[in-house]
Amino acid sequence: MTTIVSVRRGNQVVVGGDGQVSLGNTVMKGNARKVHRLYNNQVIAGFAGGTADAFTLLERFEAKLQAHQGNLERAAVELAKDWRTDRSLRRLEALLAVADKNSSYIITGNGDVVRPENDLMAIGSGGYFAQSAAIALLENTDLDAKTIVEKALAIAGNICVFTNETHTIECIDFSDEITTESKK
């Protein structure tokens, strides 16, 4: 279980996630990296769900991005098509949250592709907590996207036992600056 949250505001899109890997009620690892850059650093993907399943989907999504020259929407739709038709994929229990400088999508375990309202995405066991925090911060502050993601992850980590305080945060600045941050 995990928390992944993405916020788009101003000239940035930011995706952040915690680092906890749990097996049942036991914490197995505290510094896993669940947010990755893909396609020449132009796409950020975060995953939630079973680790092996999530990595399988991430690899397949990256292959779709390569096949479609980084077209995020096309890659997401093609992965969803595969997900629905490939028996081995249908058994995978994972979610992907993907974003580039133009759009954001959640790819669900049912093979659905959802473009979230207001380009705010949150998935995983702490997703609802992070989403609620991010909505409140977006509507009531002028904080930048990165700060909102940091605060939303911190709030989710204080509520959800399957989310920790070790975060990986990736940012695409539309002026083409790339920022990566891991912190505890």
Swiss-Prot record:
UniProt catalytic activity: ATP-dependent cleavage of peptide bonds with broad specificity
Location in the cell reads:
Cytoplasm
Quaternary structure and partners: A double ring-shaped homohexamer of HslV is capped on each side by a ring-shaped HslU homohexamer. The assembly of the HslU/HslV complex is dependent on binding of ATP.
Family per record: Belongs to the peptidase T1B family. HslV subfamily.
GO MF terms held by the record = metal ion binding; threonine-type endopeptidase activity
Cite the EC number.
3.4.25.2
PROSITE patterns referenced in this protein's UniProt entry, alphabetically? PROTEASOME_BETA_2
Its top-level enzyme class, in one word, is hydrolase
**What single Pfam family name could you report for this chain, choosing any that match?**
Proteasome
BP GO terms, sorted: proteolysis involved in protein catabolic process
The entry's keywords? Allosteric enzyme, Cytoplasm, Hydrolase, Metal-binding, Protease, Sodium, Threonine protease
Q: Per the annotation, which location comes first and is thus the protein's main one? A: cytoplasm
Q: Where along the chain is Na(+) bound?
A: G157, C160, T163
Supply the name of the protein. Answer: ATP-dependent protease subunit HslV
Query: In UniProt terms, what function does this protein have?
Result: Protease subunit of a proteasome-like degradation complex believed to be a general protein degrading machinery.
Which species is this UniProt entry from? Psychromonas ingrahamii (strain DSM 17664 / CCUG 51855 / 37)
How activity is regulated? Allosterically activated by HslU binding.
**What is one GO cellular-component annotation here?**
HslUV protease complex
Which residues are annotated as active site?
A: T2
